[in-house]
Amino acid sequence: MPRLIPLLALLLCASASAELRADITKGTPHGYGAMKVYDGQTLLFQATTRGLSAVTASKFSPDGRWLVNLTDQGYVQLWDVHKGERVKTFLAPFARVLNADFTPDSTRLLLNFWGDSTPTNFWQGTRSSFWSLEPLQRLGTLDGKGWDIGYSGNVHFDAAGKRMVTASFRFFGGQAAAVYDAATGAPIATLSRVPYPPGALQTGGAGAADARLAPDGRRALVYDVAGRLAEYDAATSQLLKVRGKVDSAGAGAQLERFAREGK
């Protein structure tokens, strides 16, 4: 049963609503953590468990129904905010989990690992997964036809929330960006690496460091690890044009404008 505790909280909230927050106090008692979830000044629920002692960050779904707690001990907690209950603990094959994301309609969850203890080997466990929240079930993986793409903590959606694009840093380097259906997780297109200019010493093209979709979801803008921006057809993966090299600040501004205006 949850226990009432003094509030000496470490704020660990990355909330979709400015009014929602999760305050977590560690070591109360030793080895445990205590969480109080608020909507503004209203306490929604509180809990004390061992699992909360390892939490490093928290994130709410856009509708405020769900909460995920990220940890540095190889798991992610999913909580139902309305019921004040922990729904599931997802087990990761590595210690520190840096991110997890909800879809804009709050019905799906993206993880950069398999999510439970059933994978047959370590590499199976590292496959990014896509979950339905009600009912809670894994719908599939987000690695398409290759292990070098998928969700690794970087995902963005079109204006309607129907498509999503990932820029993966799996296996220690920028890989191809990929576009998926945000309801089913089905792959739509793998965007080829941005080709190097003629005469360059490098071959094979540069992987994606970041990516955005146009508001209508029909085009994608990719910022590659070589510092260039390139525009793609998000359905066919055709490279439409390479905009050229920009610094990270300029790239960020162009990516955000593209997501807002498609320009």
From Swiss-Prot:
Keywords: WD repeat. PROSITE patterns: WD_REPEATS_2, WD_REPEATS_REGION. WD repeats lie at residues 53-89. This is Uncharacterized WD repeat-containing protein DR_1725. The lineage of its organism: Bacteria, Thermotogati, Deinococcota, Deinococci, Deinococcales. It comes from the Bacteria. InterPro entries: Quino_amine_DH_bsu, WD40/YVTN_repeat-like_dom_sf, WD40_rpt.
